[in-house]
């Protein structure tokens, strides 16, 4: 099964900071990770955006 690409955006400033891949069969729900945002200069929640 091919892996699909997606971007992660900061929930505070809405800036798209990270690009990642996932297997939709194993993880069908949207990804939410706490990552560093350079614009906010802090670790914030990042959500999946297609």
Curated annotation (Swiss-Prot):
Family matches, as SUPFAM superfamilies: Zn-binding ribosomal proteins (SSF57829)
GO CC terms, sorted: cytoplasm; ribonucleoprotein complex; ribosome
Gene3D superfamilies, sorted: Ribosomal protein L33
GO MF, one example: structural constituent of ribosome
Pfam families per record: Ribosomal_L33 (PF00471)
GO-annotated biological processes: translation
Alphabetically ordered keywords of this record: Ribonucleoprotein, Ribosomal protein
Recorded superkingdom: Bacteria
InterPro entries: Ribosomal_bL33, Ribosomal_bL33_CS, Ribosomal_bL33_sf, Ribosomal_zn-bd
PROSITE patterns reported for this sequence: RIBOSOMAL_L33
Family: Belongs to the bacterial ribosomal protein bL33 family.
Name under which the protein is recorded: Large ribosomal subunit protein bL33B
């Amino acid at each position: 099964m091919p892996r699909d690409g997606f971007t992660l955006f900061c929930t505070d400033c809405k800036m798209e900071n990270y690009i990642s891949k996932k297997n939709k069969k194993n993880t069908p729900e949207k990804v939410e990770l706490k990552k560093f945002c350079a614009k906010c200069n802090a670790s914030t929640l990042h959500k999946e955006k297609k």
